[in-house]
From Swiss-Prot:
Quaternary structure annotation from Swiss-Prot or TrEMBL: Heterodimer of an alpha and a beta chain.
Entries under NCBIfam families matching the protein: hip, PRK00199.1
Similarity field: Belongs to the bacterial histone-like protein family.
Protein's UniProt name: Integration host factor subunit beta
Length: 94
């Protein structure tokens, strides 16, 4: 599902919500989550999952084209861990 599909689905599910308002709401939620992660905060949505930053230490990598060694600096990467309820909901065994 893309962001525009999410907005369309919200507007269809809630007739009192104009598509423009759904777009604004989704944008504000995603901005708030991005800002929280940029500050180093953890985001927990009960029943859905949590977002946090994982630290990746500096390392020596290789340029795949030339085989030359390159220094890859340390960085933080966003990480999502699904909550128990979400894992159970998507674990459909037929």
């Amino acid at each position: 599902m893309t962001k525009s599909e999410l907005i369309a689905q919200l507007a269809a599910r809630f007739p009192q919500l104009v598509a423009k308002d759904a777009d604004y709401a989704v944008k504000m939620i995603l901005d708030a989550m991005s800002d929280a992660l940029a500050r180093g905060d953890r985001i927990e949505i009960r029943g859905f999952g949590s977002f946090a930053l994982n630290y990746r230490p500096p390392r020596v990598g290789r340029n795949p084209k030339s085989g030359e060694k390159v220094h890859v600096p340390e960085k933080y990467v966003p990480h999502f861990k699904a909550g128990k309820e979400l894992r159970e909901r998507v674990d459909i065994v037929e």
